[in-house]
Amino acid sequence: MSRDSDPMKWYHGNLSREAADELLKQGYEDGTFLVRESSTAAGDFVLSLLCQGEVCHYQVRRHGGEDAFFSIDDKVQTKILHGLDTLVDYYQQAANGLPTKLTVPLIRDLPPHNTRSHGVTNLLHRATSKNESKVVFELLKCGYRNFDAKNQDGQTALHLAALHSDEDILKHLLNAKVQVNSSDSFGCQPLHYAARSKPASFIRTLISAQANVQGRNIDNGYVPLHEAAKHGNLEAVQELLLAEAPPLPRTSSGEFPFDLAKEAGQTAVEEFLLNYKLPPANTTRDQWYHGTLTREEAVAILKKHAKELLAKQPEVDTSGCFLVRYSESPAASGLVLTLLCDQVVKNFRISQADLYQNGNKVQSGGSKFLYIDDGPYWPSVEHLIAHFMRFSYGLPVSLKYPVPPQPKPEVPSFATIPRSNMKPKAASPATPPTPVSPHSHHQHPHVPALTITKKKQKENSSSMFNTLRLTSPKKALFDMNSLRKNKSKGKRSDSESSVSGSLAGTEQELQAAAPMLKSLSFSTEFSTFNADGVTGSGAAAAGEVYNVPRNNTPIEIDLPPIAQKTEAEVEYFTKSDVAIERERAGQWIGNGYQPTMDVLSLLDQQIKAPAVARLNSLGPNASTESEMASYLHRKCSGTPSTPSATEVEAAKLRFFIEPEKLVLDREIGHGEFGSVHSGWLLRKSGAGEESRLEVAIKMLSDEHSNKQEFLREASVMMRLEHKCIVRLIGIAKGEMLMMVQELAPLGSMLQYILDHGHEITANAELKVWASQIACGMHYLESQHFVHRDLAARNILLTARHQAKISDFGMSRSLRPGSTEYQFTQGGRWPIRWYAPESFNLGIFSHASDVWSFGVTIWEMFSLGAPPYGEISNVDAIKLVDSGERLPQPNLCPAYIYAVMQSCWKERPKDRPTFVYLTEFFARDPDYQNLPELVQTVHI
């Protein structure tokens, strides 16, 4: 293979996969590589790499359309890099998840200019920088083809024209069909630079050439409007808004254009933006809003519409079919955008937030602003949808085909209502009530109706902060700054929710409706109906009923015992908690919750040894394996009835691993149920080839009596599937009961921090891990599972930048030289991680897990220091009860410590949600690649 002085000559154009295999298998060393065009996806590339005599091919996916951002399209490889040259250099420094690092390129050509992040200054660059219009014109006229080449700062001639040239050079370059939306090394596109100082005509010319008015700087989140506002270019601001640029985009630090204008002293721009009147949206909710739908119903409606669309227009691409629905899912209560892309349905939560200017809340007609992820704020859902019909940023594809809802049944006329034969009492004339919408009789007391009248539109049209509003039916919109929805409210059936214009079916609803109906004549005399329930003290009492914290935590009000509640009302507990509560008898404490354990008696005392029981005595009349399969089938299916023999056999195939397929290696830990070994699971592929998967094997001690608890926890783990959760592979029954899980090669996060603290940085590993832990806990919350033992020792590292939550009431990692926090016989209860309601009352909830999360983050930034030092558990409880909290670690920034303190609020309902914590760490401005390292949570 020939050598070349230019290390970038590894590009082989449209070389086929077969030809790449043949080239690389000619005796080259491991790590030899080439890059070629993808034959399956236009604009993508393929990295072909030789390793141990085999050629591996990795799809290199392009991000951002024509811009040069790329990543290895693999579940493990999610790092997005600017330029193919940067990507190759990244994997030349280290393997970073590939089987080997890139070593020697197979020499051919340089990659295309528009795929690189850097280059060298050429004649066109110099002429453009000096505003030499004639030289630029002659270069382009004579067929100069390097017009998209980049200089050492990654800037094309168009970038330089936006900085230094007049409109003549701009038009020359645009006539040559240069790329208008490429980013330079500073993350800026040409329109970013033009927005700083260029006149309106220059901006207009760029926009007419398809420059992206919402192009986002990957380094700081700036869009052109931010640049124009910061530099006081009012002409550019006006031109961008005329081109439908969002007026309220956010930087990575959450700053709006008017914030930047104020900081820079650009008063005229600030006042213009604050008084800007947003035009009405060019779409209406009757085109795409479906009211309350489950995820499954939305998917079915969307796919049915796409099928009908294809039947009418066979050549159409159905990607972009969408609808908006109201979700009652515990994971995301509020409005959800459901979108079809490449035959896959994706869901995006529409969040809400207040808007502040100079520390004061900006009024928005009584409702909050809406947004998706880190996208711009909008005053109504109509404006948000209209925006995403124009721009796709943040979505896989722009919104194209709205799916209309089914026609609503007509509201019955008042003429059809039976009239009383009684002579009505004398009363002053009253205006007939407005017909009730299908959702209005179940409306949240603080949320206005979905329908917006023309009069309301006129009243709210003075500025962009007072325009069309849309709030959710029944409940407030979900927001990362809000707490969770109230789950103590009774839920109606789908059939009840769908009846249009029906009268209230309960006494409480009749009471609420009575004032409106008193002036009408019905067969029932409503005028004598007692409506006190919705006025005066009655209203206050109703308010108390709904004063349950929205993050599903018990508070100081009288509640019925858990056994009298429906399963939906206690769904924020684990299913195992529900089972425990049903099995227990005894007195209930004042707030309606029975402690899961008398923890006060166990503060610093040893746990009594359990009685010895045989492992194979789970059931009196069935084999151990059948009983286990029956138990796990019931738990995983949620069916209380005894499964059939066929179902038991199916459960065996699904859950059980033959013990002879497991090979034990060394012991790596010891836990509550027994020992933990590394080992291998022997498997056969479809072709009959045998392979070995490295796993962790947890074994239940033969003398351990808690087999039912062991299997119950196993059934919970089998239902969990998330990138940030340790995966349970199966169960084996040999001489003892064994659980097979994925192996975390780096072990416990706590031990890793203790061993490698000098290598760990707060802005990299610690924030990545914190975001992944929060993401995993949010997933557990969405599955109604309370961890109850979240701590650094129970977080495992499968890679340096991948943390996973483990130990769901089962084993604990062995920490050499210390057994202080082990759940073994003679161990201690982990009081130092518990919230006050947990160690005082034995109450566990998602909010108590948030407290434990705060302590876990404190451990991380303290590099493994024990919480509260060497004091006893009793003294630690006294400190917490007196209002004291853990001090700020040296490595911890003030804004992260503030979040820790919010996790340690006395009242559970005042603590943040895991949704918020995930967003907080993933959107941290100091570490831009965090979102790519965290698994997206499904709504």
Curated annotation (Swiss-Prot):
InterPro entries: Ankyrin_rpt, Ankyrin_rpt-contain_sf, Kinase-like_dom_sf, Non-receptor_tyrosine_kinases, Prot_kinase_dom, Protein_kinase_ATP_BS, Ser-Thr/Tyr_kinase_cat_dom, SH2. It comes from the Eukaryota. Residues 662-921 form the Protein kinase domain. GO terms for biological process: apoptotic cell clearance; dorsal appendage formation; dorsal closure; dorsal closure, elongation of leading edge cells; egg chorion assembly; JNK cascade; maintenance of epithelial cell apical/basal polarity. ATP binds at I668, G669, H670, G671, E672, F673, G674, S675, V676, K698. It is found in: Cytoplasm. Following axon injury, required for recruitment of drpr and glial cells to severed axons and for glial clearance of severed axons from the central nervous system. Together with Src42a and drpr, promotes the migration of macrophages to sites of wounding as part of a signaling cascade where Scr42a detects production of hydrogen peroxide at wound sites which triggers phosphorylation of drpr and subsequent recruitment and activation of shark. May be involved in signal transduction on the apical surface of ectodermal epithelial cells, regulating their polarity during invagination. Interacts with drpr; this is required for the recruitment of drpr and glial cells to severed axons and for the phagocytosis of axonal debris by glial cells following axon injury. This is Tyrosine-protein kinase Shark. It comes from Drosophila melanogaster. The gene is Shark.
